[in-house]
From Swiss-Prot:
Component of the 90S pre-ribosome involved in the maturation of rRNAs. Required for early cleavages of the pre-RNAs in the 40S ribosomal subunit maturation pathway. The gene is RRP36. It comes from the Eukaryota. GO terms for cellular component: 90S preribosome; nucleolus. This is rRNA biogenesis protein RRP36. It comes from Vanderwaltozyma polyspora (strain ATCC 22028 / DSM 70294 / BCRC 21397 / CBS 2163 / NBRC 10782 / NRRL Y-8283 / UCD 57-17) (Kluyveromyces polysporus). Residues 1-166 are annotated as: Disordered.
Length: 313
């Protein structure tokens, strides 16, 4: 090999010399590969396991180092966040102190300023105590600004039972415009309305009996008309029953006060008894039997509840 390298001259190479040089280089590389293969063949299984273990240890150490680095970075980040929070709080407190000192310096002299600075620290505690303190019963009422104020104000002493719809009202029957309502006198004045009510009921019944008219109506319209007819009949019947009850009570009071100088007025309980007696006297035989049977069952139920197995243990 040294012979060829010594005799090499630039510009005087031949093809045979180049071929010889290539063969020599190929032989050297082949010898090196064979030597490395022989070295690997001579290695035992134990040494290979040790090498694998060393590589695994190096990989684990690298992963542990990365985990430690991550932990350190997280701790640093948390410390920075806490420092930022503390700095913000300090900045807010300094601003609050600057504002309080400015207001105190404008209000008076230096001595007075020191006095007011001590009080300003306690103002926050006083406000919180006032909020937590319960209001006095004689204090003015407070309403939420989010709710709209009602157009009609509540006047003490004028608590009236408001109907479901207050859209239309008659001022003649309002307590604020006159005396208490006398139902009997109003009933006498407007007794002629019963005739109009009866006419409306008769007309509605005639319309519902007409088959041609009913066939033109839909199911919903027909049901609405039947409901209106039923409600009109019940209203008229209640008005008539009320008139009859007042008439019966009036006749009974006139009868018991026939020869008395001082007029005696019945109580509400006595009025109920008089009405029950009058209704029972003017009932038919079947109606009386039903009433007596109902009362007998009611009395039997009360007696049955008094037994020991119904008593609470």
């Amino acid at each position: 090999m040294s012979y060829y390298f010594k005799n090499l001259k630039p510009g005087q190479e031949s093809d045979s010399e180049e071929d010889d040089l290539g063969k020599v280089l190929a032989r050297n590389t082949q010898q090196e590969d064979e030597s490395t293969d022989d070295e690997l063949k001579t290695l035992s299984f134990g040494s290979l396991k040790k090498a694998d273990a060393i590589l695994e240890d190096e990989d684990s150490e690298d992963s542990e180092e990365e985990a430690d680095k991550k932990m350190v970075n997280e701790r640093k980040r948390k410390q920075v966040q806490e420092e930022l929070k503390v700095s913000k709080k300090r900045y807010v407190e300094e601003e609050f102190e600057d504002d309080s000192s400015d207001s105190d310096s404008d209000s008076g002299s230096d001595n007075e300023g020191g006095f007011f600075e001590e009080d300003s620290g306690d103002e926050i505690g006083v406000k919180s105590k006032k909020k937590n303190k319960s209001r006095h019963k004689h204090a003015p009422t407070e309403h939420s600004s989010k709710k709209r104020v009602s157009k009609i104000r509540k006047i003490p002493g004028l608590e009236t039972s408001r109907p479901k719809s207050n859209l239309y009202t008659d001022i003649r029957f309002d307590k604020s415009t006159g005396d208490d309502i006398d139902v009997n006198s109003i009933r006498k004045r407007y007794a002629f309305l019963d005739e109009y009510r009866q006419k409306e009921i008769d007309e509605l019944e005639g319309m519902l009996k007409d088959r041609k008219f009913v066939n033109k109506l839909g199911d919903r319209e027909y049901e609405d008309m039947q409901g209106n007819l039923k409600s009109m009949k019940s209203r008229l019947q209640t008005v008539k029953n009320r008139d009859l009850e007042s008439k019966v009570i009036k006749e009974y009071e006139e009868k018991i006060n026939m020869g008395n100088k001082n007029r005696y007025h019945l109580k509400e309980s006595e009025k109920r008894k008089v009405l029950q007696k009058w209704k029972f006297d003017h009932m038919k035989a079947k109606q009386r039997e039903k009433v007596m049977e109902r009362k007998r069952k009611k009395k039997l139920g009360k007696e049955f509840k008094q037994f020991e197995f119904h008593k609470q243990r």
